[in-house]
Amino acid sequence: MAEQTEKAFQKQVGVTGCFKSKEKKAPGKSGHRFFKNVGLNFKTPKEAIDGNYVDKKCPFTGNVSIRGRILTGVVKSSKMMRTIIVRRDYLHFIPKYARYEKRHTNIPAHVSPCFRVRDGDTVIIGQCRPLSKTIRFNVLRVIPQAGATGKKSFSGF
């Protein structure tokens, strides 16, 4: 999975390595891994509870709270490390012609290692504090792509 790949040793904040008990505990409900419920009826993934990755920007195991907008979109690009581009389609009204035109916007979002995201998947993202210069959203749920629809196709409302 996402083991130690950085130069500095990665560890979860708030979880120390020196424990009084000598028996080994596996990560999970009784183990020494920090995870939380983000609320808003989003379940914590099993990989976040039982996994061994360390991500301080993960909403389930890191120091990030979800507040503000909850949006849905289609994954356009997943080439960046732990970051995806989400395409949101919408209709814009033109008063002169009394008609709507199709428009879209691209939103960069942080994706936790507990999710397996591919291009074309539908994701639910939640707003959080600024994680970098452009990233202000975090992936909360992934809905796998059902059919062979393209990633640039306009989805209905």
UniProtKB/Swiss-Prot annotation:
Keywords from the named record: Ribonucleoprotein, Ribosomal protein, RNA-binding, rRNA-binding
Any single GO CC term annotated in Swiss-Prot or TrEMBL for this entry: cytosolic small ribosomal subunit
Isomerase as UniProt keyword: no
Pfam families: Ribosomal_S17 (PF00366), Ribosomal_S17_N (PF16205)
GO molecular function, one term: rRNA binding
Disulfide bond entries: none
Biological process (GO), any one: translation
Domain of life: Eukaryota
SUPFAM superfamilies (UniProt xref): Nucleic acid-binding proteins
Family matches, as InterPro entries: NA-bd_OB-fold, Ribosomal_uS17, Ribosomal_uS17_arc/euk, Ribosomal_uS17_CS, Ribosomal_uS17_N
Cross-referenced PANTHER family: 40S RIBOSOMAL PROTEIN S11 FAMILY MEMBER, 40S RIBOSOMAL PROTEIN S11-RELATED
UniProt record similarity statement: Belongs to the universal ribosomal protein uS17 family.
Record-given protein name: Small ribosomal subunit protein uS17
Biological source species: Dunaliella tertiolecta (Green alga)
Classification lineage: Eukaryota, Viridiplantae, Chlorophyta, core chlorophytes, Chlorophyceae
Gene expressing this chain: RPS11
